[in-house]
């Protein structure tokens, strides 16, 4: 009995010491895995983000197989305290038409209005949402956080169900989403909607900190998560049909539900390190269950002359065969319709929910194991690099790889980019560009005064006129622009 009392006293003393000198940037422990790294795979073209200013210029944009356009580079960011607003005027004026593309849409007239303005940029009401890139209040983990518009890397909870979801990957169909979070010492809520006009994906998490006002135990939280695709495709077979705007016509849809419970405890929190182990139990209805056990680390290194930080996430997974971790991921808008699965010596594409149900095959045991690792390095904000890797035993296409880098603070040159490869068979398959690869990069080189040479590369998805499969298209933009801070 005395030994138990002594051991308890020592543990409490250690925990109390670990909680001293909390980091100044937030009064709340980080409730989720991606809280600090959501922007790791964000818009690389936002090279001058973080303050108020405008970029004005003209460039030439080449869209793979389609043609070349004179493109406006008109973006402005306004920041006032916690409020941020980003606007744009994105116009593509055809310069050269590739008359070999596409089946059902070869001519300049079929691709443009008046032979000039790209038609698929402005043939749906939601296209006008491109004028407002984002409207933001606060930052992730603030007491109140609101983000409306483009979602580049939005997660819910520890990111085990909804991880870095993006609504920006379609070339022709932009969406204005909404993320809204409320965080207090005792309770909090995270929400996510992919498109405020006609939402498909809706997700949320509510968490409770029973001892939110106690110095030692305040780091313990329990949460409940849920996500739903209201119109998930299923029984998708054969070629895809499309409407006049290029949206796939899916005859069979149904709601798909996913839910989970989680708990975490912040073991360490001081000026140098934050350490949070967590456990999630998730279920995808009709497909399978999964258990995630992980740890989040945020380490601040006292390096002379520069503030250096290291963030890591390591996770071990136990899964039923039909369970797909991070089901609503960065490529979900593509995968819900066209998801890669192995077939013989090749690859077939089915709806993601069909793939999950087929993989279950009546097996309810947690027979499959997997792991996830993520590392991010920040050298005083001047250089930011990182990567992630995950794999799954028993799944020949269960691996994923991601890398990113950003050099945002140098005046002469600014660089940003990322690469993500999903559903690959291993490292030998890691750098193949196809419908499972996501690549984006941007550069700004200072020529003179406020004048910069700009170059942007984007890999997006399109269901081209007359085609029956969604495919990746690459667009490259290069031109001159002026950045005016205000």
Placement of each model-derived feature along the sequence:
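Short, solvent-exposed loop/edge-beta patches enriched in aromatic
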Residues: 76-85, 139-143, 410, 447-449
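Surface-exposed loop and membrane-interface regions of Gram-negative outer-membrane beta-barrel proteins
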Residues: 85-134, 161
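N-terminal periplasmic/intermembrane-space "pro-region" immediately following the signal or transit peptide
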Residues: 18-65, 73-84, 486
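Hydrophobic h-region of N-terminal signal peptides that target proteins for export
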Residues: 10-18
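Extended, charged low-complexity segments
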Residues: 414, 440, 444-486
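Signature for the C-terminal beta-barrel architecture of outer-membrane proteins
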Residues: 49-53, 67, 98-100, 142-145, ...
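Sec-dependent signal peptide recognition
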Residues: 2-9
């Amino acid at each position: 009995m005395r030994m138990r009392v002594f051991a308890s006293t020592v543990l409490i003393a250690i925990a109390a010491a670990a909680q001293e000198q909390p980091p100044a940037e937030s009064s709340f422990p980080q409730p989720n895995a991606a809280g600090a790294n959501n922007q790791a795979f964000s818009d690389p073209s936002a090279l001058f983000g973080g303050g108020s200013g405008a970029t004005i210029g003209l460039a030439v944009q080449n869209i793979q197989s389609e043609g070349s356009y004179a493109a406006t580079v008109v973006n402005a960011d306004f920041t006032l305290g916690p409020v941020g607003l980003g606007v744009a005027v994105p116009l593509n004026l055809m310069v050269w038409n590739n008359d070999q593309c596409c089946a059902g849409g070869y001519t300049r007239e079929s691709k443009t209005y008046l032979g000039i303005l790209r038609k698929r940029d402005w043939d749906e009401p939601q296209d006008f949402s491109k004028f407002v890139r984002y409207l933001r209040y606060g930052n992730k983990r603030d007491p109140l956080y609101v983000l409306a518009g483009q979602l580049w890397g939005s997660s819910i909870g520890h990111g085990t169900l909804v991880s870095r979801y993006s609504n920006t990957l379609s070339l022709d169909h932009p969406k204005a989403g909404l993320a809204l979070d409320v965080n207090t010492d005792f309770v909090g809520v995270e929400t996510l909607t992919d498109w405020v006009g006609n939402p498909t994906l809706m997700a949320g998490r509510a968490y409770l900190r029973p001892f939110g006002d106690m110095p030692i135990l305040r780091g313990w939280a329990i949460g409940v998560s849920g996500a739903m695709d209201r119109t998930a495709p299923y029984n998708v077979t054969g070629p895809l049909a499309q409407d006049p705007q290029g949206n796939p016509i899916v005859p069979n849809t149904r709601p798909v539900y996913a839910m989970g419970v989680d708990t975490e405890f912040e073991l360490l929190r001081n000026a140098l390190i934050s350490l949070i182990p967590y456990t999630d139990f998730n279920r995808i209805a009709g497909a399978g269950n999964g258990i995630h056990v992980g740890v989040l680390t945020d380490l601040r290194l006292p390096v002379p002359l520069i503030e250096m930080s290291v963030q890591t996430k390591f996770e071990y997974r136990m899964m039923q065969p039909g369970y797909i971790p991070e089901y609503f991921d960065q490529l979900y808008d593509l995968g819900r319709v066209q998801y890669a699965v192995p077939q013989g010596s090749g690859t077939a594409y089915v709806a993601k929910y069909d793939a999950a149900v087929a993989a279950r095959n009546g097996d309810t045991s947690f027979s499959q194991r997997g792991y996830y690792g993520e590392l991010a390095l920040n050298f005083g904000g001047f250089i930011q690099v990182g990567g992630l890797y995950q794999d799954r035993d028993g799944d020949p296409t269960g691996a994923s790889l991601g890398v990113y880098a950003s050099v945002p603070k140098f005046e002469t040159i600014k660089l940003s980019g990322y690469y993500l490869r999903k559903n690959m068979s291993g490292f030998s398959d890691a750098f193949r560009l196809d419908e499972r690869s996501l690549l984006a990069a941007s550069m700004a080189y200072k020529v003179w005064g406020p004048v910069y040479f700009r170059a942007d590369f984007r890999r997006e998805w399109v269901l081209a006129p007359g085609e029956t499969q969604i495919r990746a298209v690459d667009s490259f933009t290069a031109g001159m622009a002026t950045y005016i801070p205000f």
